[in-house]
Amino acid sequence: MNVSVVTERRTPAYSSLAAGELNGLVARALLTEARLTPKPGLVDIRNSGAHRDMDLAAFERSTTAIAPWMEKFFIMGNNTAALAAENVLVMLRPLGMACENDMLQATNGVNTHRGAIFAFGLLSAAIGRLLARGEPLEQNRICDQVARLSRNIVAHELSARKAGKLTKSETHFQCYGLSGARGEAESGFRTVRTQALPVFNRVVQEHDDTHLALLQTLLHLMAWNDDTNLVSRGGLEGLYYVQQQAQKLLWQGGVLVEGGIEAMQFLDDELILRNLSPGGSADLLAVTWFLSHFPAGSLYPE
């Protein structure tokens, strides 16, 4: 059995965070997710999942390329804290595009982290805004700022009828009502806050095992997240198949019962055969690990 065990103890919650520290925390989040094994259909230590154009080394190179950009997102958020949040997104886009270019250069043109750049760019800018305003760094405040930065992004970018061929994201929304990464950001990472973090925290508390907590959390994300990466590869049938298989494993106890890891490996093999990769859930898992390093805070920040 070939699995990667995450043995790192959870670090104390951050009450403050320098821009340079943010780069390191994001890099650790991305590498923790990438190296977690076994992950059904995803790149990990065991194999390259349903991907023929990337491997773990590509994810590690990509992380090295994009992590330094988080400081730039942080600074932009910090410098524009006096502006209405919805007016800042347009200023973050050039940073995101430049960061993506560095990723593609590091991976020879392979998209390893486009979704993660979007998520962590917003999170970094949100943290910069909070610190500029003297507000505490708490999960709910950070996510509330992300929601404010992303306000109306689904309506503006996915709902509007445009001339020419629809993008994949527009097709997913206009045909199936799936808003993908944009919808998750606009909701302030609702799936992470209401599903992933509670599972992660509970398993860590009950089992003192970050590796098991991350795998169990991934299963929950695969079971309930409407992952548009799966729709791109296998249509709604592919999405529903993965959700049903993950739910089945959870009903059996997931990775917390005997044989759970082997069941994850079997599902990995099945998703590879079907060319299915839950990349959106992988991004949310990295976000979950990242946010777990901050206190939860009040549910409704002022």
Curated annotation (Swiss-Prot):
Its EC number is 2.4.2.52. Gene3D superfamilies: Triphosphoribosyl-dephospho-CoA protein. It catalyses: 3'-dephospho-CoA + ATP = 2'-(5''-triphospho-alpha-D-ribosyl)-3'-dephospho-CoA + adenine. It holds the Pfam family CitG. It comes from Salmonella typhi. InterPro entries: CitG, TriPribosyl-deP-CoA_syn_CitG. Belongs to the CitG/MdcB family. The gene is citG1. It is an enzyme of class 2 (transferase). This is Probable 2-(5''-triphosphoribosyl)-3'-dephosphocoenzyme-A synthase 1.
